[in-house]
């Protein structure tokens, strides 16, 4: 069997057992994009407007829903409508990290009711495998997917070594099929288990075309480094795309800022897809 990195998204989708991961791979192939935009804004309308601006260029929109100061269920309704209109999936970056019973409640209930609208979410393995079973109890019947945080892009992150190995091991032990991949900086599944035949997605943050860091510990690599060199599947880009909204000029002229957001979305989509085509030998 050839390395997963040499297979097309379409061929991988055909063999993918997790419904959310299958839908994501199909979307990536259909739209010719491996771009996920991380929208870390604190205003409901800005979140929706960024989705509108980047929707045609992305396969996935990543939210931190708990930072939205004027959150209501209408936001969820409109976000879901935009995902259908522009054909992308939603990833709530919740980073669950508690015992099974607690995370199942955090996932299904509370103010945000994440499981009802987010196709994919993620978790730290620090509490042990019960974090997987607790979330699977809620998410698997809904066809959702879970990513384990095997590695992080911030300087000094402790997600390495034995911890990363444990994430890979638990993903392969998961009999529910709910775990569908990792947040990681490289192809950790093949690196840690050379003979694995299970296809687990690798979504990678810390991607930028113009800067190498942010002064707060974030470290950036290019789409080519992430997709072609490291063999990852999805690039996660945040401020490199929506950053125009945070400048004084952007705050003063939002129309121009959102035009820039759209332009950057197109730029990263092209860079990510070109890197993928080179990886599988089609360019």
Swiss-Prot record:
InterPro entries: Aldolase_TIM (IPR013785), OMPdecase (IPR014732), OMPdecase_AS (IPR018089), OMPdeCOase_dom (IPR001754), RibuloseP-bd_barrel (IPR011060). Substrate binds at residues 40, 62-64, 93-102, 220, 239. Pathway: Pyrimidine metabolism; UMP biosynthesis via de novo pathway; UMP from orotate: step 2/2. One of its GO terms (biological process) is 'de novo' pyrimidine nucleobase biosynthetic process. One of its GO terms (molecular function) is orotidine-5'-phosphate decarboxylase activity. It catalyses: orotidine 5'-phosphate + H(+) = UMP + CO2. Its EC number is 4.1.1.23. Gene3D superfamilies: Aldolase class I. The active site is at 95 (proton donor). One of its GO terms (cellular component) is cytosol. It is an enzyme of class 4 (lyase). Keywords: Decarboxylase, Lyase, Pyrimidine biosynthesis. Belongs to the OMP decarboxylase family. This is Orotidine 5'-phosphate decarboxylase. It comes from Mycosarcoma maydis (Corn smut fungus). The gene is PYR6.
């Amino acid at each position: 069997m050839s390395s997963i990195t040499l297979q097309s998204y379409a061929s991988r989708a055909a063999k993918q057992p997790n419904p959310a991961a299958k839908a994501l791979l199909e979307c990536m192939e259909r739209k010719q994009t491996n771009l996920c935009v991380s929208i870390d804004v604190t205003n409901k309308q800005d979140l929706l407007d960024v989705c509108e601006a980047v929707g045609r260029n992305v396969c996935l929109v990543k939210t931190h829903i708990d930072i939205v100061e004027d959150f209501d269920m209408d936001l969820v309704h409109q976000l879901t409508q935009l995902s259908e209109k522009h054909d992308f999936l939603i990833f709530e970056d919740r980073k669950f990290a508690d015992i099974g019973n607690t995370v199942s409640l955090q996932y299904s209930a509370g103010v945000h009711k994440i499981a009802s609208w987010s196709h994919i979410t993620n978790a730290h393995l620090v509490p042990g495998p019960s974090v997987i079973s607790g979330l699977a109890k809620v998410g698997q019947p809904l066809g959702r997917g879970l990513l384990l945080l095997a590695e992080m892009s911030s300087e000094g992150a402790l997600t390495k070594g034995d911890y990363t190995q444990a994430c890979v091991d638990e993903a392969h032990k998961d009999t529910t099929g709910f775990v569908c991949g990792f947040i990681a900086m490289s192809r950790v599944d093949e690196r840690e288990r050379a003979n694995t035949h299970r296809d687990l997605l690798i979504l990678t943050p810390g991607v930028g075309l113009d800067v190498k860091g942010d002064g707060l510990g974030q470290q950036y690599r290019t789409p080519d480094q992430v997709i072609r060199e490291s063999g990852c599947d999805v690039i996660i880009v945040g401020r490199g795309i929506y950053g125009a909204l945070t400048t004084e000029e952007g705050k003063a002229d939002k129309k121009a800022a959102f035009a820039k957001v759209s332009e950057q979305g197109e730029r990263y989509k092209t860079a990510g897809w070109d890197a993928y085509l080179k990886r599988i030998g089609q360019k």
